[in-house]
Structure formats: structure tokens, C-alpha cells
Amino acid sequence: MVFRLSPGDVAGFKFLFSLAIMYAIMSALVYSIVHMKFIKPLAIDAPLDRFSEARAVEHVRVLVQDGRQEGRPGLREAAKYIKAQLELIEDRAGSNIRIEIEESVVNGSFNMVFLGHSISLGYRNHTNIIMRMSSKDSKDADSSVLINGHFDSPLGSPGAGDCGTCVASMLELARLIVDSGWIPPRPIIFLFNGAEELFMLGAHGFMKTYKWRDSIGASINVEASGTGGLDLVCQSGPGAWPSLIYAQAAIYPMAHSAAQDVFPVIPGDTDYRMFSQDYGSIPSLDIIFLLGGYYYHTSYDTLDKLLPGSMQARGDNLLSILKAFTNSSKLRTAQEREALRASSDDYRDEQAVFFDYLSWFMIFYSRRVAVVLHSIPIAIFLLMPFLLHFLELGLRSWFAMFCDFVKGLLLHAAGIILAIVFPVIFSIMRLFFSSCAMNWFAHPYLAFMMFIPCSLVGLLIPRTVWSCFPLSQDVSVLKKSKEVLSDEAWFWGAFGFYACLTLAYLVAGLGGGFLTFSVSAFMLLAWISFNAYIKSYHHQSLWSTVIYVVPLIPCILYSVYFGGFLVQFLIEKMGMMGAAPPPYGFYIADGVVAAIIGVVTGWCVGPLIPICGRWLARSSIIQFLLHISVLALALSSQFFPYSNTAPKRVVFQHTVVTTDANRILDSSYDFSIVDSNSLLFVFKYAPEVAKDLHVGTDFSFKTANMSHRETWMALFPVSHLFSRSLKFPASSDDIIKEYRYFPHLSNYKPHTISSKGSRKVYLELSLG
């Protein structure tokens, strides 16, 4: 049997392949931008008045030589190295600049909510290194700018990215300020804090004890959730001023107000919280490396994993932003901010709307402007039926046209929903025939191959089913053809869908409304171009569709940029987002990634569907896309989920339960995982581990010893991300030989009960 294509099918496939080429070119451009391919790092012999990534990398090289975890000698050595480098910078400074260096040991206690759990923390003897740089004429009370980075590293990690890059960038920046001869008009405080990984203790100690903390008028927190890539402003505030300064000053702007809508969902936090939210209300920026998350908090976070160009972009940006902050008339001390808040009715903590375009330039507008701008699309959608029929036929059939527009809106919404649902269904179906989840984890392109084609199928189904739009208007009365009226209904329905989403963002007070607003704005331009072509040539053709697509290219390119980065970031983070209990936990990671790719596909392709759907919504194309989806699903099952550059995270703990000062009750190895592939997967593909733990081929969770959540109290509340942790017996002989006495708690005084019924217990901790 010969499979024949009609001329319309041939034209549709030509158009589909043309779109595929367009999106491929856009994806290649976006990949280059996100991975800093267009930024040339300066060499170690670069001019001294320029920030040099190579010089900064040399600092990272020293910092990663030994572990910088709290309690290890490497942390103390890192503090000595940082202080020595700052003293060298002080020696090079001219007579017109004042540099003060201080090593501070902080103690304190506080309560915080982390991952939805309230925890209380007490700490002592944590080290902060502080340098205050100011002009000779400055006063102690002058408002200043704080830039913060932490030099401790997480357990088991060299910490090249997190946060050796932060410390190195700050050291090179401090050197640059001195060697360039720039005298800051306001003081700049460099804080190298030594305890961020332990619930931000160093930043808390600084905010509670530093003598000039009330003089700080703005802060910049530099962080790393990976080894480079986009250095994104993930949080800013309170107020719009910090993001405005960034928009005006950044050389390579990388910021989206939408990030503040997403950041609270991520299981983590930064020192930004201490400065701008919990203990300071300081106008702040939280700037974070986001790519390379595979290595985040692992032993793979090494010097060779750093993405070239990332620190160069960060350094150039930071210098420009520091200059803008120190020159701003809005840089105020804590007392001045409080006085302004009390006396001015115009003082607002409203968040602005801002976004960068491919890190080339940045668009910023206030919340008040957003209220007006983001209301325009819905106003156009509601008024357009009345305006069109008032100009053409009076008031007689405007309601029928509005009904058609609403039908178009509902059908477009159905397409977007199906574009999300279909990939989720396909991801679940694949797992029915596979023994492992997350095959895309080490190979992100597999996720796009698997889920984009089936998402397109969902997007096209409404247009395929309703190839003839169910018009409410009477074609016999109107001077327009049914084809033209259908195109109007499809277009204005889709436009109305994005207008409604824009309004929903606005009402909810979220910062991501610019995403759908830009789609609405460019769709209008495309519609005007399309109609101008039709009026000139009096017929629709493939060229008229191309005329519709061309004005949308800037919008589509941004959608690919934002959406592609979002998917890449999410895929990297799925390896540490936690393990849900079976049976549903096995499907969650694949379902989430499939749903996000469906959303991104709907966002990137959805604006094209009203006009391009005429060529794409054909049964032959639907079948072709389904075949690609099935083939990609089958192909992906042949790939192993992990690799040396995308390792699986396994949490291992040697647990020793003691009583009194010298007796061991129990000794065990506790294992857990933080993604969808269980420990059975680990034992299957890491036979050495199974052998050491005496795990046989007949092992099952039903007969295994489960590790109780209380066992992981040292990692609370991160331990709530674990599921089905296992416990294996361990010998205690080596421990008894090594230690004569163990840490233990004892009462050193009888407990007391207050008049209100609360009990006070007096405990003494002996370290053994």
C-alpha cells in the first residue's frame, strides 16, 4: 500500500520542517548565550584596570585545595588566605582611599522557618572576614553598600562553584577597585562570611553584631547553585529600587521578575534572606549562578567544571552595579529609610516588572505602569467585537462575534491544556515499560525529543477536530467568507487567552505577567501584518502565513530563551528535589518535566497556531508527530539516567547510638536517595555497594530494615525530602578503639516549672 500525501499535506510538512529549522537555529543561539559562549574571559595578564576571570580562577584554585566545611582545618586556612589577600590589596591602595580589615568571630541564636519547618539555632565561634573600603573624606555614618559571599562549602564538596567563585570574584573586584584608581563615593563593605551552608549563621551574626550594619543602604548577595551560566537576579527588594539600579547598570543583564514567583518553590535559601527580609529590610539583590546544578553540593564541584565566561560576566556586572549603587541618591541608612517610610505616603515596597532580552538589554517598568500596560490586552479583547461590527454592520451581530471569540479562547485553552497533558501521559506510559525513571537526567535533549512532538499533538488537536470553526455569526449576512471569520475567531480567541493570563498575573501580584503580555503585543503586530498582506493580494497562501510568523520571531526567540533555560535548570535540579513515597513517587519527576516542557511548548508555539494551524492541523502531520514521540520514548529507554557529569545523589550516614559516656547501643549505615530511582536501582547498578552491605539478589523493601526519620535529625529539615531510607548493620569495634568517651547530654541541675506551666531543663553537652 502506497502512502500518498495531498498537496495540502506536502505544504504542511514543508511549513513544519521550516518551523523546525527556525526553532533549531533559535535553540542554538540560546544555548550559546546561556552557556556564555559570547563572553571572552580575560587572561591573567589582562590590564589591571579590568576584571580578569583568569586571575579570579587562581583564587578558586587555592580555595578548593582542602575542604572548607565547618570544623575542618581547610575553613580556617581559607579565612587566612582571604585575609592575606585583602591585606595585599590594602598595601597597594593609594593615600586617597581608606581600607579597614576586620576578622570577626560571631555567636548568637535565632529561629527561622526553612522548608516549611520552624527550627531554632544556636551557634558560636564562626568567622567572618570584613573589609570596608571608603574615601579618606568619608564618615562612619555614611550610607554604604554591602557585597556578600560565603567561603564555607557544603559537606563532601570542594565548593569550587558554591561558593569559591563568589569569594574569588569579590577578591578580584576589590583588587580592581584599588588598581583602577576609582574612589567609591560611598563606602563599600566586602563580607566574606564563613557559615552560610549552616543555615546562614555567618550572615545572621554579621547583622546582629557588626558596628556599621545600620549604615548599609544596599546589599548584593552573590551565590552559586551551580558552576556558572546565567548569573541571574533571583530575588530583589524590598521595593523596586535595587532592580532599577541593576537594569540601568548591568553590562550583561540577567534578571527576570518572574524568578521571584518561582524561587520560593526551590528547596533552598541564601544570605539575601538575612539582609533584606528577616533582620535588615535592606534593599538587596540576590545574584546566583544557576547552571551546572548537576555538581551542586557534590564532590564533583571542582575547578574544571566551571563554565568559562561566567565569572567574567559576573565581575563586569558587579563593578558597574557597585558604581551605580554608590552614586545613587537613594542609598540611605536604616534610620533614613525608616524616616522616609514614616513620613512619605509615596513610599512603597511594590515589586517592579523587569526582564532581560537574551542578556543584551533589559526592560524595566514600575508596578503602576504594569497595571496600565497589562490591562490593555484584555480591554482590546473585550472591545474588539464591538469596534469591528460598529465599523461594519452596526450593533446587530457584535454579540455573535463575541461568542465566536470566546469559543476561540476556550479552544485555544483546550489546546494548551492538552499540550501539557499529552506529555505527562506519554511519560507515565513509558515508565510502565521501564525499570528506571529520569532517563533524560544526564541527556536533557532526550526530554525535548520525547515530549515536544506529543505536546504539539495536543496543541493541534482542537484545530484538527474543529477544522471548520463552529461560527455563531451568520455568514450569509456578512461580507466576509467563512474562512476569514474562522481565522478571526481563532486569532482573537488565542489573543484573549493570553490577555486573560496577563490579567491573572496582575491580579495575583506576580512578576511574570510580562511573559504573556509580550505574546499579546507581538500577536497584534503579526495580525496587522497578516491582514495587510491579505488586503494587498486578496487571498491566503503559505506566504501570508510566513508574513504572520515573521513579526512574532522576536517574541518566539525570547520564549525559547526563557523556556529553554527553565527546562535545563529544572532537569538539573530534579536530581535533588526529593523522593516521594511509592507507588506515585516513581512517576513524579518524569511527570513534572513533561508538564513543564508542555507549558514551554505551548508558550513557544501557541501564538502561531491561530494562523499556522491551517497548515499544521492535518492527520498526516499528527501521525508523524506521534510516530516521532513513540520512537523517542523507545530510544530514551536505552539510555542510562546518570553519568560522570550528571551523578546520582545518594545520602550516606554512619549512625552510632550511644548511652552514657562509653557505651554503644547500635551502629548502622543509613542510606537514602533524593530522586525517583530507589535504592534498589543503586544496588542493581552499583554491585560493589550491594556486596559491602551484604545485599543479595532476593533483597526487597518488605524484608529490609527501614531507617527512621529521627535517624536523620542532623540534616533536619532536609531529611523530609527522603523516602524509604534503609538501615544496614555496621561494626562498632573500630569506634570503641578510637574513642574512650562519647558525646553525651546530662542534667546538671534539677528542672524547674514556671507559674505559667512551662518547664526549663538544664542540660550539659560533653563532647567526650
Report residues per predicted region.
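Extracytosolic and intramembrane catalytic regions of membrane-associated proteins
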Residues: 80-132, 245-248, 658-768
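N-terminal Lys/Arg-rich, disordered targeting/topogenic segments
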Residues: 1-9
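Soluble extramembrane regions of membrane proteins in the secretory/endomembrane system
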Residues: 41-365, 768
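Alpha-helical transmembrane segments of integral membrane proteins
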Residues: 3, 20-29, 377-725, 733, ...
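Cytosolic-side membrane-insertion boundary helix
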Residues: 346-381, 397-405
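Alpha-helical transmembrane signal-anchor/signal-peptide segments
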Residues: 34-57, 641-662
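C-terminal domain-closing interface element
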Residues: 210, 214-233, 370-396
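Hydrophobic alpha-helical membrane-insertion signals
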Residues: 15-24, 28-45, 82
